[in-house]
Structure formats: C-alpha cells, structure tokens
Amino acid sequence: MKAVLLTLAVLFLTGSQARHFWQQDDPQSSWDRVKDFATVYVDAIKDSGRDYVAQFEASALGKQLNLKLLDNWDSLTSTFAKVREQLGPVTQEFWDNLEKETESLRQEMNKDLEEVKQKVQPYLDEFQKKWQEELQIYRQKVAPLGEELREGARQKVQELQDKLTPLAEEMRDRARSHVETLRQQLAPYSDDLRQRMAARFEMLKAGGGSLAEYHAKASEQLRALGEKAKPALEDLRQGLVPVLESLKVSILAAIDEASKKLNAQ
C-alpha cells in the first residue's frame, strides 16, 4: 500500500512524458499538463452549463418561475474562478516539490525509456518506409481508374467501384501484415521495458528505507497542500452561501406564487 502513492506519482510524472521520446518534443511540466487539462475541462462545463441554464430561463416554465438562475450561475462561476486563482500558487508548489523529490527515480526511468527508444527506432523507420511504399503503389494502381472515371459516363461508376474494391482489400491486407510484423518486432522491447520498470520498484521495495522516505515526503506534501488550500476552500464556502440563499428565496417565492394562483382558482 505504501507504494501506491509513489507509483501513481512516478507514472504521472514520467509516463505522460514518455511520448515525447517518440515525438522528440519538449515535454510540458506536470503542473502545466494538469493546469491545461483542468482549465479546458472546467471551461467546457461552465460554458455548457450556462447554455442549459439560459435555455431553461428562456422557456415558458423558466419565465414563470423567474428563478434568476443565470445571475446565480454567473456568481458561481466567478466564485470558482477566484478560488482557482487562489489555489494556483499552492498546487504549483506541491507539484514542484513532488517533482524534486522523485527526480532521481524519474531520471533512471527516462534513461530506460531512451535506451528502448534507440533500439526500436529502426523498426519504426522501416515500418514508415514500407507504409509509404505501399501508399505509392496504391496511388499508381488507382490513378488509371480515376482517369477512366473522368472520361467515362455514369454507367462506368459501378465498373470503377468493382475495380477499386479488390485494390482496397489488397491494401488493407498488406497494411495488416506490416502492422503485425511491427508488433512482433516491438514485443520483446515492450516486455523488456516492463521488466525494467518492475525491477526499479522492486529495488525500492527491497530498500525499504528509500520507499518509506518517498512515501513520507509525498504524504507531507499532501498534508501541506491540504492546509494551504483551507483558506481558499473556506472562501468558496462563504461565496456559495449567498448564492444558495438567493436561489432558495427565489424557489420559495415561485412556490408561493403558484399556490396563490391555485387557491384563486
């Protein structure tokens, strides 16, 4: 159980960077990835939620109830934005500390990834070369058929389709063959990488003290994050109180109005 937190942290910090070995891009920091994902996700929820609220208020029932949900929604999004700004430096510090504490382990894993990449790169290059050759052959076979279609009449469309079908099937079968060959070539290296990662964690378990030290430091960082986040969360709670109270008053007023109309009938 002690290894769970460390495993998740290391996989998050190194695993999502592994793709940059294949793409040769500059990796984002862990905090940048979290921040970008959270921003996109929250903004999407905010925008779609506001659209639903606006649609409801524009409906006959929404106009009759007059709950002013859109005003409350804007207040909520403003409150959440403020809390997100307050938590930004706190979470940034947490990720910086966590990356610092796991730096040596991440370096070892990145070294393993680089070694495996160098071994499998020739197979990837060969696969790409064969794929380009297959595409060129397919284009050469299809080009005359396209010329026939341009010169022919509508009745030749079916004839053209009949000629294209076996070519497409041949292309599909050849592509599957190349993919299967690549899979078989890469399988040993994939197993080797898994074994290396497993060996790293076994060394940590055998070390005992190192694993306990990583766990203790990560737990300490989480506790510090919780303590520093308390003021922002309290601000969030205080900001929600008037919004919820306003919504409660609007609902009670709508119910009261509906009751009066029913009694009048």
Curated annotation (Swiss-Prot):
One of its GO terms (cellular component) is chylomicron. Sequence repeats lie at residues 67-88, 89-110, 111-121, 122-142, 144-165, 166-187, 188-209, 210-230, 231-241, 242-265. Glycosylated. Gene3D superfamilies: 1.20.5.20, 6.10.140.380, Apolipoprotein (1.20.120.20). One of its GO terms (molecular function) is protein homodimerization activity. The modification Methionine sulfoxide is found at residue 109. Pfam families: Apolipoprotein. Residues 67-265 are annotated as: 10 X approximate tandem repeats. Keywords: Cholesterol metabolism, Glycoprotein, HDL, Lipid metabolism, Lipid transport, Lipoprotein, Oxidation, Palmitate, Phosphoprotein, Repeat, Secreted, Signal, Steroid metabolism, Sterol metabolism, Transport. InterPro entries: ApoA_E (IPR000074), Apolipoprotein_A1/A4/E (IPR050163). GO terms for biological process: acylglycerol homeostasis; cholesterol efflux; cholesterol metabolic process; lipoprotein metabolic process; phospholipid efflux; positive regulation of cholesterol efflux; positive regulation of phagocytosis; positive regulation of phospholipid efflux. It is found in: Secreted. Residues 1-18 form the signal peptide. Major protein of plasma HDL, also found in chylomicrons. It comes from the Eukaryota. Belongs to the apolipoprotein A1/A4/E family. Participates in the reverse transport of cholesterol from tissues to the liver for excretion by promoting cholesterol efflux from tissues and by acting as a cofactor for the lecithin cholesterol acyltransferase (LCAT). As part of the SPAP complex, activates spermatozoa motility. Homodimer. Interacts with APOA1BP and CLU. Component of a sperm activating protein complex (SPAP), consisting of APOA1, an immunoglobulin heavy chain, an immunoglobulin light chain and albumin. Interacts with NDRG1. Interacts with SCGB3A2. Interacts with NAXE and YJEFN3. This is Apolipoprotein A-I.
